[in-house]
Amino acid sequence: MGRNQKQNFFAARKRQKRENGPKRTDRQAQPYEEIKRDNAFFIKYYQLQKICATDEEWTQFLASIRDNLPTTFRVTGFKDEAKALLSIIETQLFTEYVRAVAELHQKAPEDVERPLCLPWYPNGLAYQLHLTRKDIRRSEPLYRLHNFLIVETTAGGISRQEAVSMIPPIVLDVRPTDKVLDMCAAPGSKTAQLIEALHAAPEEHKIPPGFVLANDVDNNRCYMLVHQAKRLNSPCLLVTNHDSSVFPNLVTTKPDGSKAILKFDKILCDVPCSGDGTLRKNPDIWLKWNLAQAYNLHGIQYRIVRRGAEMLEVGGRLVYSTCSLNPIENEAVLQRIIKDADGALELVDAGHLVPGLKYKPGMTDWKLATKEVDQIFTRFEEVPESLHTIIRPGMFPLPADEMAKIGLEKCLRVLPHLQDSGGFFVAVLEKRRQLSFEKNDVVELVKLNETAKQPAAEPQVDADGKPIEEKSVPWGPQRKKRRLHGYKEDPYVFFGENDPDYQAIKEFYQLDESLSQRCLLTRCVTEKKKNIYYCSEPIRDLVLNNENNIKIINTGVKTFVRCENRHTVHPFRLAQEGLQTSNAFMGASRRIQVEREDLVMMLNCTDPTQPPSTHELKKETQERCKELGVGSCILKYVDQRFTLYTVGWRGTSSLRAYVQKDETIHILRLLGADLSKFETNKYEDARVAAAAAADAEVGKSAEAEADSSGDGDATESTFSGSGAIDVTVAAETTGTPMDTEVVATS
């Protein structure tokens, strides 16, 4: 009890409370206190705005927003195997879904409603399940569905995303040649959609000429954005961290070598909002909602869309969206920017891009009120002076004649009850001419960037070698150094001409001349290259011209990884993440076509120290192996429906796949192989663990009883001490080949 032999009263009380209180497993079974889905101010305010045409519709609206949100997901459309995965979903997965839901709700299978294919999503690639996220996560009959959603999301086969959140990228209408800016991109589900659209024509472009620049003001959320977007392994993505309302002008290099201010073809402004359209997904908003949120956000929303309009190319398209129902955050912001643009911006109707979507037109009349909705204002003159800093003139609707010219009815208002979804607002703007308030001075911007790149001047010293203090200050206002928040990022070091590592890579993999070594980069300056990344030419140009102008979080896709092995002279292996890119430029010498049975066997081999022997492969594959030297290679499998490419390793007498666990399961699913080896049932695992813990507790009690009744001469248990088996080590041996840098050569 310590040196002073005094017992700590507070520690003892805490220990007693922990021992006598409910166990963690007991608490997990207890639900959170149910949130009361009601807010008098919310109901009064939206009744005032007449967002529903009739009392009957208002009743439907209230019933809908008080209900939980169904789960939705979409299939990644640009991948070659998308149709095959969709077929598996519609047959195997949904058959299992019907069986599990019938068991969960104790219904007959024929009474279970099948998942709904969203009619407005392109190519029928999105589905809505009549289950909530909590249903899927906490119900044992649905564990296979839960496993599928987790694995396929990680592998990039699908994306879990709220249905209405899919609308803005669709109406933005991105093409492979577009320069796209996502101004408020985190957490990244819409960014992933934009990347998919950019890669929609792989047969036309090895690497899309366009790019997606995804930005967010929150440094931590930027890493969430990277995690979401990296699943698609695009070399055409750049992630930045900046306040989008003051996003800097970026410099780009024109074909003639001159510099220019970058203008974007497509811009997505999914601005911060009060989020009251997400009440079904986030019921805690019922407790926090108040009208002051919309008033506070209106200004920042306007500044973001105004900055977006400045950076938009003439003829370009900007989509403004929120997950709010409030006209103060929606129509009021749009009428203000359109009025300030003085004819340079025009609202366009994009309803034809989402055929089958049910929505209402934008509002042309609305009212403002106090926080408690006890005073209603129709004109700014009615607002008390004490509220003038909160309620501004631009928030009120324009006179009817001016409003008619703006065309706010072209906006899309999606209400929850229309198609069992969340609430959302979308508007599409096109730029007809340059804005009067645009600033396009490229000369000063280039000078600032070049100055930042110059090395620091040598310090001046006196006769004794001591540094001389600088006392003179340049004349005029001084430019403050921008403070960067968050983590300090590693540098982006691009390959120079005749880089020795690139020459070795090019020779070993027979890389095409069209793959520019200038676009390969590492994240270290002095150390030996470990990971080599690839980015597209436009992304490289953006990084080099603007690395001192904006904080860059991430770019490039991992393409080559150092993996030295005594049986091969080449020190770099291919990375599965970059295979989508490198495959388009590689020669035939490091490729091998394999049969289905071979690929299934290799993917099922999860022990990196025991790779499949070439003698176990089919004869056709064995013959092809004879022409392939030791080292990294591409395994190609051709199916009637799709072609699969995976990274492999040819050992001296073995051939193995080099794929992470989730992608392994994804490929095996496409091949129709048995997945039981990888299947996990967390409920069964919990029961086994609980039973083991109970047995251990019984054993301890028996041992204690024996000790108390014995004469004190009992020997130690043969299972104690260093001879005990560590079951966690045994469990960890089921890891995947990517968990280690060991390369088997047997």
From Swiss-Prot:
InterPro entries: MeTrfase_RsmB-F_NOP2_cat (IPR049560), MeTrfase_RsmB-F_NOP2_dom (IPR001678), RCMT (IPR023267), RCMT_NCL1 (IPR023270), RsmB/NOL1/NOP2-like_CS (IPR018314), SAM-dependent_MTases_sf (IPR029063). GO terms for cellular component: cytoplasm; mitochondrion; nucleolus; nucleus. The active site is at 323 (nucleophile). Its EC number is 2.1.1.203. It catalyses: cytidine(34) in tRNA precursor + S-adenosyl-L-methionine = 5-methylcytidine(34) in tRNA precursor + S-adenosyl-L-homocysteine + H(+). Residues 731-746 have a biased composition (Polar residues). Pfam families: Methyltr_RsmB-F, Pre-PUA_NSUN2, PUA_NSUN2. One of its GO terms (molecular function) is RNA binding. Its main location: nucleus. PANTHER family: NCL1 YEAST -RELATED NOL1/NOP2/FMU SUN DOMAIN-CONTAINING, RNA CYTOSINE-C(5)-METHYLTRANSFERASE NSUN2-RELATED. This is tRNA (cytosine(34)-C(5))-methyltransferase. It comes from Drosophila melanogaster.
